[in-house]
């Protein structure tokens, strides 16, 4: 009986459900879809979504569509089309779909990462980018801050010589200090409880954000109890309490003649808007807006960088010959009398190539945060109506056999010329930080952190698989960030480093 009722309801829904505008022949070819549920019944149920979407290109081509519930969504898996969306028509596709889970993270669309492309978003993005200008010179120079934290991390690891360590925890704490310096001009000792609190709510939020949150597809499901949403709310509450405390301290110390961090810039912008009575901007600088922008720096800057550093270590454990080549470069070009600097990138070519290859083979976000068409537009030969969601499958771009030789193989040398003496870009199908109006604002920071941290680690330590332990799993866990499964590494102080420090009397076993 119930089966007949359900069948009848489906038939009626199909007959009377409003036909979408996207039925136009010029709209990208679509997966099958049903009323209400869309294409969900026809999507693969196992494996990583970015890989499944890549495989669907074999049948549907480099651009195709599907329906997530009733929402028309276009999937892009070719770099020419991706660059059209991100760069050539970046403003037309700079919108962000509003989702229940991301709304909780962004105080309902505030900040930068998940905000729609309105005036407030543009203003906060501009101010966030301007904050990096504060860290160009002097003691606040960004490279100086990074090197100090990298050295502190290495000093901590010295106390674990010849031990098996999960590097993710100390790296997370170290990178958090860099973000705290940029946002608040503060830093913390490794054992400070505030760092543990930040790690707890950051990882808690990430664990709640995956590709199976049906409430983002069917928002009406919020009328029912939802454990995931409750967890997100709890973690966001803790996050906001921490950031509010830091914000209030910045307000107390604020000096309009001494702007030293991102929060100072936002406070100053709020004061200017209030003093000039510019009503267009006054509403953009509530504490909620400021907290969301600062929160985006924490959410997008810490776990992403930590994850990539762990991926780099994992691939070096799988490819020890690459690690030895990098250490040889370090020994020959830097030695042991000074800390590596970002200028050394011109000489540590294998290290830079390794970083680029890891960002290719395991992109931070295999599917970039979805975009939304702000107006009726087009991609290639296809018409794209306003409000259509557009997903760039970065995994497809980075694993296209037409663009990359043996794309599933780790080959840093692909980013070097035939002589190994110059860095190259072997394909335009490479967008590890996105591009256009929605490009990652922390790209410069991330590249410096990745280079300097790995250089410092390999200058001082040998990193090996612990005796009897398995190799790190390279499959990964794709959430908002492509995480690697936890693993341990044996940390051993290099003999060459010991000898060099002993000569100048700084080595203490």
From Swiss-Prot:
PANTHER family: STEROID 17-ALPHA-HYDROXYLASE/17,20 LYASE, STEROID 17-ALPHA-HYDROXYLASE_17,20 LYASE. Keywords: Endoplasmic reticulum, Heme, Iron, Lipid metabolism, Lyase, Membrane, Metal-binding, Microsome, Monooxygenase, Oxidoreductase, Steroidogenesis. One of its GO terms (molecular function) is heme binding. This is Steroid 17-alpha-hydroxylase/17,20 lyase. Disulfide bonds: none annotated. It catalyses: a C21-steroid + reduced [NADPH--hemoprotein reductase] + O2 = a 17alpha-hydroxy-C21-steroid + oxidized [NADPH--hemoprotein reductase] + H2O + H(+); progesterone + reduced [NADPH--hemoprotein reductase] + O2 = 17alpha-hydroxyprogesterone + oxidized [NADPH--hemoprotein reductase] + H2O + H(+); pregnenolone + reduced [NADPH--hemoprotein reductase] + O2 = 17alpha-hydroxypregnenolone + oxidized [NADPH--hemoprotein reductase] + H2O + H(+); 17alpha-hydroxyprogesterone + reduced [NADPH--hemoprotein reductase] + O2 = androst-4-ene-3,17-dione + acetate + oxidized [NADPH--hemoprotein reductase] + H2O + 2 H(+). GO terms for cellular component: endoplasmic reticulum membrane. The keyword Lipid metabolism applies. Signal peptide: none annotated. A cytochrome P450 monooxygenase involved in corticoid and androgen biosynthesis. Catalyzes 17-alpha hydroxylation of C21 steroids, which is common for both pathways. A second oxidative step, required only for androgen synthesis, involves an acyl-carbon cleavage. The 17-alpha hydroxy intermediates, as part of adrenal glucocorticoids biosynthesis pathway, are precursors of cortisol. Belongs to the cytochrome P450 family. The gene is Cyp17a1. InterPro entries: Cyt_P450 (IPR001128), Cyt_P450_CS (IPR017972), Cyt_P450_E_grp-I (IPR002401), Cyt_P450_sf (IPR036396). Regulated predominantly by intracellular cAMP levels. The 17,20-lyase activity is stimulated by cytochrome b5, which acts as an allosteric effector increasing the Vmax of the lyase activity. Gene3D superfamilies: Cytochrome P450. It is found in: Endoplasmic reticulum membrane; Microsome membrane. Its main location: endoplasmic reticulum. GO terms for biological process: glucocorticoid biosynthetic process; hormone biosynthetic process; progesterone metabolic process; steroid metabolic process. Heme binds at residue 440. Its EC number is 1.14.14.19, 1.14.14.32. Its cofactor is heme. Pathway: Steroid hormone biosynthesis; Steroid biosynthesis; glucocorticoid biosynthesis.
